């Protein structure tokens, strides 16, 4: 068990484990999952995150022992106030970049504050990803679950206290949280307002990547992933339960808190990870390695090595390559890249890419360092130096990402993004090598 920075919160360490936790001693049945009478008069309930017959290495499921079963709810009704889920915008092959979205003036809780940015599949498909930016200034009083996919939260501003069915975790900038599909949760704002990024993964659950020749250690180490311990609410009284189903919000009113799980065991769990613990791998000789070495989490497809979605970070690191153009190289890619910035500056963009902002480089969109960065890199003294006080990230996917209509029409879309490459000169001289 691991104690986090908050003195009242504890976590279980590891990734993909068969965890077990109980808030009351003896609340977990011994030797079976569904006894005739569960301890303390609890109900046994199974939450499946994958099909029953998946390989054991792929299986995600958790047994919950709760005060009331989830089946105890009235009919869901479609809410009058729906999330901003506009249709995908017109086809647009251009490189796009957005300035940071403003925090709303009117009271907005976490689930009201999603701005859809890009997507590549409707929610009913068992693959693809939808990407949002969230902006909120009010803690949730209701409880939410997402039937459409697994949620990866990347805070950029403001700490979040996330009360889930399995326990409570806190995350802030430079940390991430993952919440399984269908798991109920409530988000409280610890700093009054919050902004960040969301990847809604419609495909296979996220996992840490294989290390291959790197060996048995490196990148995101399993022990640094933290899952909350069991914690339950026994509150009586009206609570709104909201679900996101095929992009729409539907709600019902309960007379109790649905976060009433007293004990649980399994592998389908929420977790958090501190990005500062990422063991960065890089060259110690020459050239800039492929950015796949910065992968924190991946959602695979049935094609070996082809990701439904990768979550990649560009953390502080030493640059020591000799006789090398050290920024990320110019590139045209089969994959689609949505980038965000949590803090500092990105080493391939001297200006215009700000914390809370975003960019999209679609399939085969030419991209790379801007003119100012390129000029400095070519002339740089190649002494070892550290890129510090920065954290950029990328959601990368093998399916084409299309921006939403809101993302194409919002005032934060930078009309002059292409100009950052406009002054790249031709330095070719056939008479001088």
UniProtKB/Swiss-Prot annotation:
Enzyme's top EC category: oxidoreductase
Active site: 288
One Pfam family matching this protein: HgmA_C
Superkingdom of the source species: Bacteria
Outcome of gene disruption: Cells lacking this gene are unable to grow in medium containing phenylalanine or tyrosine as the sole carbon sources, and accumulate homogentisate.
UniProt record, GO biological process: L-phenylalanine catabolic process; tyrosine catabolic process
EC number: 1.13.11.5
InterPro entries: HgmA_C (IPR046451), HgmA_N (IPR046452), Homogentis_dOase (IPR005708), Homogentis_dOase_bac (IPR022950), RmlC-like_jellyroll (IPR014710), RmlC_Cupin_sf (IPR011051)
GO cellular component: cytoplasm
UniProt entry tagged with the keyword Metal-binding: yes
Names of required cofactors: Fe cation
This protein's UniProt keywords: Dioxygenase, Iron, Metal-binding, Oxidoreductase, Phenylalanine catabolism, Tyrosine catabolism
Function of the molecule: Involved in the catabolism of homogentisate (2,5-dihydroxyphenylacetate or 2,5-OH-PhAc), a central intermediate in the degradation of phenylalanine and tyrosine. Catalyzes the oxidative ring cleavage of the aromatic ring of 2,5-dihydroxyphenylacetate to yield maleylacetoacetate.
Record note on quaternary structure: Hexamer; dimer of trimers.
Protein name listed in UniProt: Homogentisate 1,2-dioxygenase
Organism: Pseudomonas putida
Gene: hmgA
